[in-house]
């Protein structure tokens, strides 16, 4: 099985009412969740822009769009398989990205997106390898 075959889209439950919305991006019950803490971060992408463009030989990540929409472009570094995943907020999903899969998040809309991410490792520049899509 190639690394890109390990990418999983995990449906989430978006709870909305008059006050706003609630969404669990990481529940702690995920298949590949580590037993230690990594990093949680947010990133915003402007219309027509892309964020990322790299892969991690060791770290794995989980991505959840919490506002707007984007396309997550993936490429397996070993097999060179490609995959594009549409990530509109309304779809309420988290995408697991295994190590060795290059990723870039492209804003294909006319509004900003906000992405919530979790990685199982603390940031290490040596584990972030630039990749041009």
Residue locations for each model-derived region?
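Non-catalytic, conserved peripheral segments adjacent to functional cores
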Residues: 1-94, 108-133
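Glycine-centered loop/turn positions within well-structured domains
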Residues: 103
């Amino acid at each position: 099985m190639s690394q890109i075959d390990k990418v999983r889209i995990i449906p989430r439950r978006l709870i909305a009412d008059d006050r706003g919305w609630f969404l669990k991006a990481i529940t702690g019950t995920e298949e590949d969740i580590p037993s230690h803490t990594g990093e949680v971060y947010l990133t915003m992408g402007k219309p027509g822009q892309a964020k990322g463009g790299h892969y991690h030989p060791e770290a794995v990540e989980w991505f959840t769009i919490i506002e707007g929409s984007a396309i997550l472009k993936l490429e397996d570094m070993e097999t060179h398989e490609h995959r594009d995943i549409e990530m509109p907020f309304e779809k309420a999903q988290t995408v697991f990205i295994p190590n060795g899969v290059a990723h870039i998040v492209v804003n294909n809309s006319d509004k900003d997106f906000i992405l919530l991410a979790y990685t199982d490792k603390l940031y290490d520049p040596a584990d972030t390898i630039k990749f041009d899509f």
